[in-house]
Amino acid sequence: MAVGKNKGVSKGGKKGSKKKVVDPFTRKDWYDVKAPNMFKNRQVGKTLVNRTQGTRIASDGLKGRVFEVSLADLQNEQDAERSFRKFKLIAESVNGRDVLCNFHGMDLTTDKLRSMVKKWQTLIECSVDVKTTDGYLLRVFCIGFTIKDSVSQRKTCYAQHSQIKNIRQRMTTIIKREIINSDLKGVVEKLLPDSIAKDIEKACQVVYPLHDVFIRKVKVLKKPRFDLSSLLELHGDGGGKAAEVSTGAASGVVVDRPEGYEPPVQESV
């Protein structure tokens, strides 16, 4: 038997020793997650956060959260071509009970990527760092696979090293051309139908036939300084309360005062 007192075990029989169990969800609130107006389905879902208590503000706990949503859910379509693409949305501001999100990245599902890799073909991929017109630095990854043409009798369809370099160069050129002259909203609108990948597939047919060409991933490396008005424009609220407040404060109101008027001195504040 051990000698000494066990400080971890308290003597029973004391009144008030049992603490009242409080459900943690009673201290939390639900907020609606709103996607930008580039997508058909603006209501992405709901998220929980602790209520504002003391110096802990609820909106500060929401900002910076990243939500990953399938493109099929964002577009309200059950098309198989949309279900394997995932868009990341980041919470940037809170308006009442709405969490206003912005584009934060795109990715393909793991099962789609694994299903495309097969034998007897060449995998070609590239990555490009491009800056949009509104100051977002994006890293875009592209992937494609060679395919046999109708004339070939071979079992394999391997591309030569010079052809791979040529295809990779064409991928880089097209991605830069499509993104460097667009803002973030324009880039997302091009990612929805994957028009950049289709242009790459057409341009590379001259070098070697390709199939399963996709923009595999998009990362946001750098962002410009946060601007609430541009975020409200993305959500279709550009002429809302924030614009009215700014215009009202800028215009002001002219009040007639007699000459020599002095405001009264306040005794208490």
Curated annotation (Swiss-Prot):
Residues 1-20, 249-269 are annotated as: Disordered. The keyword Cytoplasm applies. GO terms for biological process: translation. The keyword Metal-binding does not apply. This is Small ribosomal subunit protein eS1. Pfam families: Ribosomal_S3Ae. GO terms for cellular component: cytosolic small ribosomal subunit. Belongs to the eukaryotic ribosomal protein eS1 family.
